[in-house]
């Protein structure tokens, strides 16, 4: 049978970091206030020359090197982003060109913070049906460009960054020791909650980009239940449960949400990858960046059972179970 295997992974961050103390210089907040409520200590902010595309290119190049491949080996690029360089064309096409790729195809997916989960699931489907052999899946966002920097409830939460994975179709014998790759995926969305987390602008309405707006307490109220339900569904689809898990890689939005979700799922905090303290919420880049850090730190190893999950505006949410 065909399995989608993560062949390589990489990440990219802007050059400039912004600490909680830095933010406290221009908005009424403090390091202790932010850390206590979110777990975030710093985030990275793109400069004028750094964009969703440039960060995406950097992450893609790192993933290709990690995979031992070149852009000539890639058939498709899927970019998850909510902050494209232009309304159109798709930023994925710009990344395709910047990488020197003129074959195959590229397109964007928009599912906010769940974007990488949606993109990886789409890539998995393309590989299993034979549309492509290798796909470059990227999550890249520059949320600093859509933040109201006078709103202390949102500007402290987000950072910029990109992460990428090379997904490859491999013939796998199911049930044997070498059986690895994506085992199950589950995606969900419900537009009834769109007013809980959104951007108050757009080309078809205000003709302006707008700013990110969020009802933080409402998001927290729904997040843990939605996340844990979809993770349980993902386990069930693969005939497994949380006791078999080696690593839990959640969306890095808020440390309290991460800890509450892990507790409800019965996953030891020692098995949870947490990078929100270093990066803040990088939206679609969150999960691949956390994966990259976990691999660089020597945590995730070949054969490990890894659960990815994310939740974003919409609401959108999803989970992916992978045998590394």
Swiss-Prot record:
Pfam families: ACP_syn_III, ACP_syn_III_C. Pathway: Lipid metabolism; fatty acid biosynthesis. It catalyses: malonyl-[ACP] + acetyl-CoA + H(+) = 3-oxobutanoyl-[ACP] + CO2 + CoA. Keywords: Acyltransferase, Cytoplasm, Fatty acid biosynthesis, Fatty acid metabolism, Lipid biosynthesis, Lipid metabolism, Multifunctional enzyme, Transferase. One of its GO terms (molecular function) is beta-ketoacyl-acyl-carrier-protein synthase III activity. CDD domains: KAS_III. GO terms for biological process: fatty acid biosynthetic process; secondary metabolite biosynthetic process. GO terms for cellular component: cytoplasm. Residues 252-256 are annotated as: ACP-binding. InterPro entries: ACP_syn_III_C, ACP_syn_III_N, FabH, Thiolase-like. Its EC number is 2.3.1.180. Belongs to the thiolase-like superfamily. FabH family. Homodimer. The last Arg residue of the ACP-binding site is essential for the weak association between ACP/AcpP and FabH. This is Beta-ketoacyl-[acyl-carrier-protein] synthase III. It comes from Bartonella henselae (strain ATCC 49882 / DSM 28221 / CCUG 30454 / Houston 1). The lineage of its organism: Bacteria, Pseudomonadati, Pseudomonadota, Alphaproteobacteria, Hyphomicrobiales. The gene is fabH.
